Structure formats: structure tokens, C-alpha cells
UniProtKB/Swiss-Prot annotation:
Organism from which the protein derives: Rickettsia felis (strain ATCC VR-1525 / URRWXCal2) (Rickettsia azadi)
Name of the protein this chain belongs to: ATP synthase gamma chain
Cellular compartments per GO CC: plasma membrane; proton-transporting ATP synthase complex
Role: Produces ATP from ADP in the presence of a proton gradient across the membrane. The gamma chain is believed to be important in regulating ATPase activity and the flow of protons through the CF(0) complex.
Localisation per UniProt entry: Cell inner membrane
């Protein structure tokens, strides 16, 4: 009987866990759907900013100032700035593994070349994975809020802008998971700086863009860096929720399979007990 009690307790426990994983699956699916719509809007914004910068830089009347040139040229003998986007929480499968693996490989390659390294880490899981081995390289760490927060984006952008303006870094690369679908996330290594000068053979009318005030290129650079960070954050968030949704779906299915096996085992145990009792009753009656 004690065995039956243990089986019932275990079935109850697994069912409770199954309810939690199912709820987490539904929450992640809802969050992922919302973020996907934000990604669609950000794609258009990034394309517009890139096109505008390409057009303006192709116009002879716009010349880059010394400060602006820092964002388009590689500054020798300065640090490589690596921005790592991981998750704040776990239970999202291998979401963080591919990112951390690529970052470690790149750090090793840069170390072999004798180059300087700076790390900006976004997300608790990324920080925990890198702090022991690369604590000296970590310049900043940001926790990832539960919802998409523009303040985080602005803080990261300010760190990047300040590092470039103060000639502290030669380039900036961002690591994030790009969302394909709920089951597939693509590890992406994207260069933010120096900004590539787009080449467009089409002639742009000098009068096409009108801008009142100074610092046109500087403002565009701000918008460009901001949009790149925002895009990566959204992609990373969508990928995280997709990975978590898939992981929780698998956990729910596994729980269901386990419940079926435990129920079968329970029924067999009960049947065995009943059979044993019947045999004892029959044996007793025959003895009489």
C-alpha cells in the first residue's frame, strides 16, 4: 500500500509541474507574438535610417567632422568592444549556449593576437557564464528587465558612443540570437562600428534632404546605433521567448508521458495487490 501511496504522490507532483510548464509555455507564446510585431516595425526603421545615411554621405556637400569620422574608421591599437546579449532567466533550452560559446571563441582569438577587449554584458545568465574567466574584460553589466525598456537601450548606446568618442575602442560587435521561429534561433555576430559606408550608384538630389540645424550626421549616427541595439534586443527577446516556449512545451509533453507511465504502473500495482488478495482468499477457503 505504501508503494501505491508513493505513486499517487508522484503523479500528483508531476501533474502540478505540468500545469506550471503549460502556463509558462502560454505566457512565452503571448510575449513572443507581441515582440514579433515590434521586430517588423524595427526592420522598416533600420532600413530607413541606413538608406538615409547612405544617401546623405553620397552627397558631396556633407563632409564628416573629426568627431564623426571616429564612427566610420577603425582606430588602431584600441580595444575590441563586444556586446553580449543573453537571457535574464533560465528554462530556455540552449538559448545562451551558442552565444557564450561564440564569445569565448572570439575572445580566445583576440587574446592570441594580443588585442585589447572590453565586454558589455546584457542578461544575468551571460554575466554568470563569463564573469569568472573574463572578469577583467567586463566594462559594464546590465540586467534585462521583464519588458522591453528604452532606458536600457539608451544606457547601452551611451556606453558605446562614449567609448568611441574617447578613442577607447576600435570596433564594436554585438552578439545576439536572431529569431527565425519558435524552434529556431540563429546565433548572430553583427558589427555595429565602424559604420560601413553604403555605396549606391543611383544619383541623390542634393535638395532631396532638407535639415534645419547642425550636426546632421551626428544625429543620424545616434539614431543608427540606437536602432541597431533596439533591433538586437528585440531579436534576442523574441528568440528567448521562443526557446522558452519550446522548452516548456517539451517539458509539458514529457510530463504527460511520465504521468501515463506512472498511472499504468499504479494500475498494475493495484491489480497485483487485488490478485494477491484473491489468491489468499481462495487459498483460505480451500483450507477450510
Amino acid at each position: 500500500m505504501s508503494n501505491l501511496k508513493q505513486l499517487r504522490t508522484r503523479i500528483k507532483s508531476v501533474k502540478s509541474t505540468q500545469k506550471i510548464t503549460k502556463a509558462m509555455q502560454l505566457v512565452s507564446a503571448s510575449k513572443m507574438a507581441k515582440i514579433k510585431s515590434q521586430i517588423a516595425n524595427s526592420n522598416f526603421y533600420i532600413e530607413a535610417i541606413s538608406k538615409m545615411m547612405s544617401d546623405i554621405l553620397s552627397i558631396d556637400m556633407y563632409e564628416l567632422s573629426i568627431e564623426e569620422q571616429k564612427f566610420f574608421n577603425t582606430i588602431p591599437n584600441k580595444a575590441n568592444l563586444l556586446i553580449v546579449m543573453a537571457s535574464q532567466r533560465g528554462l530556455c533550452g540552449t538559448f545562451n549556449y551558442s552565444i557564450i560559446k561564440q564569445v569565448k571563441n572570439d575572445i580566445k582569438e583576440l587574446e592570441n593576437k594580443g588585442e585589447q577587449i572590453k565586454l558589455i554584458i546584457i542578461g544575468k545568465k551571460g554575466y554568470e557564464a563569463l564573469k569568472r574567466q573574463y572578469a577583467n574584460y567586463i566594462d559594464s553589466y546590465f540586467e534585462l528587465p521583464k519588458i522591453h525598456d528604452e532606458n536600457l537601450m539608451l544606457q547601452v548606446k551611451q556606453k558605446i558612443m562614449s567609448a568611441v568618442e574617447n578613442l577607447e575602442v576600435s570596433n564594436c560587435v554585438i552578439y545576439f540570437n536572431k529569431f527565425k521561429n519558435a524552434m529556431t534561433q540563429i546565433m548572430t555576430r553583427q558589427q555595429i562600428l565602424p559604420i560601413e559606408k553604403y555605396h549606391d550608384d543611383s544619383k541623390v538630389d542634393d535638395d532631396y534632404y532638407e535639415y534645419e540645424g547642425e550636426n546632421l550626421i551626428s544625429n543620424l549616427i545616434n539614431l543608427y546605433v540606437n536602432s541597431q541595439i533596439n533591433y538586437a534586443l528585440l531579436q534576442s527577446r523574441a528568440s528567448e521567448e521562443g526557446a522558452r516556449m519550446t522548452a516548456m512545451e517539451n517539458a509539458t509533453n514529457n510530463a504527460n508521458d511520465l504521468i501515463s507511465k506512472l498511472v499504468l504502473k499504479l494500475n498494475r500495482s493495484r491489480q497485483a495487490i487485488i490478485t494477491t488478495e484473491l489468491i489468499e482468499i481462495i487459498a483460505g477457503s480451500e483450507a477450510v
